[in-house]
């Protein structure tokens, strides 16, 4: 808990300056000096510099969104609607920190492996928190589908910078893949009955 508080304090000091595309791994030490942030503190908390700041930002977005939506998710029966609630809240939180979100998303686009890791972690956390126990698609297939929906939604938001359009875009994707899962499950059940597999 103490480390999270320390991370948050350092991140808040840096956040205003992260909105500038001039900040990078090579000149971050100069920024730390000007903001009177001890290098030892920073490198203990964020040893991989902007990579770790980026991961922390997305993790924080998820935690904020999760707290806001968790009770509504638990009341909802439909997995597609649960997923949509989570994803919508993430996009709203992302949009509320527009400049910082643009900075880290742009940074992630230049570091695709890092962005993939972050988005996969988000999809895994969402899947765990919505409590899906259905068997229409495999464990990894569902995460991969959600990974693509989240990634596409982030790219769509980055292109349009329009929260409303992005929410509509992500909702259509979630509903489409929900229907694919139901269709696959129904087809499997039909084959089992017909051929007694």
Task: State each model region's role.
Residues 139-158, 168-176:
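Hydrophobic alpha-helical segments that form the core
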Residues 40:
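Key DNA-contact positions within bacterial/archaeal DNA-binding proteins
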Residues 159-197:
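C-terminal peripheral helix-coil segments that are non-catalytic and often amphipathic
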Residues 68-101:
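Hydrophobic alpha-helical connector segments
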């Amino acid at each position: 808990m103490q480390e999270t508080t320390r991370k948050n304090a350092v991140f808040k000091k840096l956040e205003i300056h992260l909105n500038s595309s001039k900040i990078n791994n090579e000149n971050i030490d100069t920024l730390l000096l000007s903001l009177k942030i001890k290098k030892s503190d920073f490198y203990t908390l964020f040893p991989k510099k902007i990579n770790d700041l980026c991961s922390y930002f997305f993790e924080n977005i998820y935690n904020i969104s999760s707290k806001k939506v968790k009770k509504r998710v638990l009341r909802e029966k439909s997995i597609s609607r649960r997923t949509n609630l989570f994803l919508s809240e993430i996009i709203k939180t992302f949009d509320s920190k527009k400049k910082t979100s643009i900075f880290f998303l742009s940074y992630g686009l230049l570091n695709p492996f890092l962005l993939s890791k972050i988005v996969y972690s988000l999809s895994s956390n969402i899947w765990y928190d919505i409590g899906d126990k259905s068997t229409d698609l495999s464990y990894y297939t569902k995460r991969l589908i959600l990974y693509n929906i989240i990634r596409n939604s982030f790219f769509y938001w980055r292109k349009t910078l329009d929260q409303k359009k992005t929410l509509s875009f992500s909702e259509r994707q979630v509903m489409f893949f929900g229907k694919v899962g139901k269709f696959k499950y129904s087809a499997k059940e039909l084959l089992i009955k017909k051929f007694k597999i």
